[in-house]
Design a protein with these regions (language model features):
Chain B
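Positively charged n-region of N-terminal signal peptides that target proteins for export
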Residues: 1-4
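A generic alpha-helix propensity feature with a strong bias for hydrophobic helices
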Residues: 15-18, 99
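Homeobox/homeodomain signature
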Residues: 9, 29, 96-99, 191
Length: 408, 258
């Protein structure tokens, strides 16, 4: 139940063959789910009462213990309180029951677990331009919990595997009795079962999107920001693929667990229009968001540029800069060029550092690289001055002794 | 721990009609603890599943609780017989002077080392430089530190899983056997069975001195080789797992010479 999971290995599923035949009978497209139809299926303080769900929750207890004690977590108390407040706002009836953890993983994702705890990846916080976008992802994940998706999909899986097992056994016995080979039909049925499972999974994602849009609007956020998030993601993946001279995986395959991003964006736009009440004021609370993530924003950018994905990094920085450039963004823009290291990138980066240090909020490292670039260009005196500034800003830097030697 | 369990389970799955298999490895210098030793059992990881008609494993909370209680009781009884003093941890915060994080770290470290043992001793990726060296793995300083702080001689890590075949799957099995008379034979659709492992760590040296894996089950759904939900079944599994600890290679050879 994650925001965007990676697809299963298709090849592993193709072993049985017969894909073309099955594809004819199962469509990929599906109708949009209306936010108005999305009523939460659980109330406050929900506790499982059915045997299968109790078992699932018991297992999750141990998982949550592992997650909570993981050293991958970012434990900044103010930031965690902020995220907990957010899920407490857009979490619907279960708002006060859900827990949220922030994992230091520079990737765009979020996961909701069956017993109501969510894990947000730090890469998500980098990409969100305002609180509404983040609240949108959290509302989507809450939607999974409120609509009881995990136990529903488990029961669906159980039911379908039961039917398949009984069906193939009955088919085999019947075939044996009548002397007809039924192996091919059994394989086709297996594929049909697998395909219907993925279809069910996509349907739940669509439900969570619709539920999320509704929760967002109910709490005074512009629901259109959920569609914007997808637009940014598609743009980022396009930019990343273009840089590698590849094409973006457009999704929408029969084996996709999530609907294609393009389709999700389109549906979310329609849903956003539906849940928006004319005349009501909606606020994306951007300032509050930037304030909350300010202690870790530099780390987030640093993680991203080190992923060696210059196409995506550049797109991301430019997207964030649509709300205004600052020293931090300018510095990391230059870092993308420096680390990309194509022909002429050193000059481009040098210019970038020069621009970055003109901002009052430029990080100390901008002065460092600005100084080193100047020295490389033969402008010794100016370079030393910049390095001196770096040392003044960060006297205890790991490389301070080396820089001091260069300056003296 | 769970990942380790699954990897081992795949490795040992032999399409036999019904069997109980154990395979243990020991440090070449290992002598089974006897007499006045102090053993710390890290939280036993116990799960009992119900196998659905379609063959899915569904965790059952009540059965799991029952089995965990029984396994712990059986462990305590067995170790008492051997003369050891045992403490079985139910939570991570039960050791005075040792933080919850330290226990969690050791559990995770053991899980990683255990994965290596599974890979190189059970999954076939044998290391040519380690042949005839017995079990040559260590948890290092962290385990020694735990021993120093708590005064225990050994730590035992344990995992046990039992899968109980549901009525629907047994019915399906009956149909599969009945089919044999008309020419469509499915006599072993499988599904149930037990899987467990135990790992003994010497807290004086930090080394993993002994490792054992038990698999008990049958490919015929409905035929069980034990049931850890009952006290007898738990005692049986604990006995299979820890009952016959063999000394290490060099210790055995020295004994033979004498």
């Amino acid at each position: 139940m994650c925001w965007r999971c990676h697809e299963l290995d298709r090849r592993s599923l193709l072993v049985g063959g017969g894909i073309a035949t099955a594809a004819l009978s199962t469509g990929v497209a599906q109708a949009r789910i209306r936010p108005a139809d999305m009523k939460p299926l659980i109330g406050p303080g929900f506790r499982p009462t059915d045997t299968d769900e109790i078992g699932l929750w018991q297992q999750m207890q141990r998982v949550e213990e592992e997650v909570a004690g993981s050293n991958l977590l970012i434990k900044d108390p103010a930031l965690i309180r902020y995220l907990q407040d957010l899920i407490g706002t857009v979490g619907g009836p279960a708002a006060k029951d859900m827990r949220i953890y922030l994992a230091h993983i520079p990737d765009f994702n979020a996961v909701m677990f069956p017993s109501g705890f969510a894990v947000i990846f730090s890469g998500l916080l980098l990409r969100m331009r305002n609180e509404a976008q983040l609240a949108g992802v959290i509302a989507h994940e809450s939607g999974h919990f409120l609509r009881r998706h995990m136990i529903r999909s488990w029961r669906d899986l159980k039911r379908k595997s039961d039917i398949f097992a009984i069906g193939s056994m009955a088919l085999g016995v019947a075939g044996g009795a009548t002397g007809v080979y039924t192996g091919d039909i059994a394989q086709l049925a297996q594929l049909g079962t697998i395909l219907s499972l993925f279809r069910y999974s996509r349907e739940m994602e669509a439900e969570a999107d619709a539920m999320g849009a509704r929760l967002l609007a109910d709490n005074g956020y512009p629901a259109i920001e959920m569609a914007n998030t997808w637009e940014q993601l598609i743009g980022e993946e396009d930019a990343s693929a273009r840089h590698r001279r590849k094409r973006r995986d457009r999704g929408g395959s029969l084996f996709a667990t999530h609907p294609a991003p393009g389709a999700r964006m389109a549906d979310l736009k329609v849903s956003a229009a539906e849940v928006t009440v004319p005349g009501r004021a909606y606020d994306s609370r951007r300032a509050r968001y930037l304030q909350a993530i300010s202690p870790i924003r530099k780390m987030l950018l640093d993680d991203q540029v080190k992923l060696n994905d210059p196409g995506a990094s550049q797109y991301l920085i430019e997207t964030l800069a649509r709300d205004g450039w600052n020293g931090l963004l300018r510095f990391y823009e230059a870092e993308v060029w420096r680390l990309r290291n194509r022909h002429g990138d050193d000059l481009r980066a040098a210019q970038g550092y020069a621009v970055a240090v003109a901002y009052p909020d430029a990080p100390p490292e901008a002065w460092r690289w600005h100084g080193l670039s100047l020295i490389k260009a033969g402008r010794q005196a100016e370079g030393r001055a910049a390095l001196t500034r770096y040392l003044a800003l960060q006297p205890n830097a790991a490389d301070a002794p080396f820089i001091r030697q260069m300056v003296s | 721990m769970r990942h380790l369990g699954i990897a081992l389970m795949v490795a040992l799955c032999v399409p036999a009609a019904g069997c109980v298999q154990t395979r243990q490895y020991a440090d070449v210098q290992f002598t089974p603890p006897q007499g006045d030793y102090r053993l710390l059992v890290m939280r036993p990881d116990v799960t009992v599943n119900s196998v659905t008609t379609g063959g899915m494993n569904e965790p059952r909370a009540d059965w799991t609780e029952q089995a965990r209680t029984n396994i712990i009781a059986a462990l305590a009884a067995q170790q008492l017989q051997r003369g050891g003093k045992v403490k079985i941890l139910a939570r991570r915060n039960e050791l005075p002077g040792v933080s919850e994080e330290a226990v969690a770290d050791l559990e995770r470290l053991h899980s990683a080392v255990g994965n290596s043992i599974a890979l190189h001793k059970y999954l076939g990726a044998y290391l040519p430089t380690k042949s005839r060296r017995g079990l040559d793995y260590t948890l290092g300083e962290e385990a020694v530190a735990l021993g120093r702080k708590t005064g225990y001689d050994y730590a035992l890590f344990m995992f046990a899983e039992d899968s109980i075949v549901s009525g629907g799957r047994v019915a399906l099995q009956v149909l599969g056997v009945a089919g044999c008379f008309v020419g469509f034979c499915a006599p072993n659709i499988g599904g149930g069975g037990q899987f467990a492992y135990a790992s003994l760590v010497d807290l004086k040296t930090g080394e993993v001195v002994w490792f054992n894996v038990v698999q008990a089950g049958s490919q015929i759904a409905g035929i069980k080789m034990g049931d850890i939900r009952t006290p007898q079944g738990s005692a049986q599994l604990v006995e299979r797992l820890l009952g016959r600890m063999k000394p290490g290679y060099e210790v055995r050879r020295a004994m033979e010479k004498r």
